Amino acid sequence: MPTIQQLVRKGRETLVEKGKSPALDACPQRRGVCVRVYTTTPKKPNSAMRKVARVRLTNGKEVNSYIPGEGHNLQEHSIVLVRGGRVKDLPGVRYHIVRGTLDTAGVNGRTQRRSKYGAKRPKPGQAAAAAKGKKK
């Protein structure tokens, strides 16, 4: 434990908090190019094939980004918008790709939480028909 005199001379060093999405450089989103699009398996209790893309951002950094929603159209040189937000059961995936922007298409047939997945609002007659088709 330091003496009062030592604290007067040196003071306490403040701890610097590490950010949750450092590759974005304090920006809300960043544009990037897909370097590799692949699937990976989650951590122990869960089981799935999660869709992930390795993205080179405009600031030169490369990050692993999760592709949300069912189905996607991303390939190797697709241009995408990346936002922060980790995937709890995928180690090393700390970013999400924004659906419905740049080269990323929105999720087809999505009726709820559409804004999160870049889906357009269905026309009044089509919503009922799509719901009936899903039930069968």
UniProtKB/Swiss-Prot annotation:
InterPro entries named among the record's database cross-references: NA-bd_OB-fold, Ribosomal_uS12, Ribosomal_uS12_bac
Biased composition annotated in UniProt, kind: Basic residues: 111-123
PROSITE patterns: RIBOSOMAL_S12
Keywords for the protein's UniProt record, in alphabetical order: Methylation, Ribonucleoprotein, Ribosomal protein, RNA-binding, rRNA-binding, tRNA-binding
Residue span of region Disordered: 104-136
HAMAP family associated with the record: Ribosomal_uS12_B
Main function: With S4 and S5 plays an important role in translational accuracy. Interacts with and stabilizes bases of the 16S rRNA that are involved in tRNA selection in the A site and with the mRNA backbone. Located at the interface of the 30S and 50S subunits, it traverses the body of the 30S subunit contacting proteins on the other side and probably holding the rRNA structure together. The combined cluster of proteins S8, S12 and S17 appears to hold together the shoulder and platform of the 30S subunit.
Family: Belongs to the universal ribosomal protein uS12 family.
Name recorded for this polypeptide: Small ribosomal subunit protein uS12
Organism: Parabacteroides distasonis (strain ATCC 8503 / DSM 20701 / CIP 104284 / JCM 5825 / NCTC 11152)
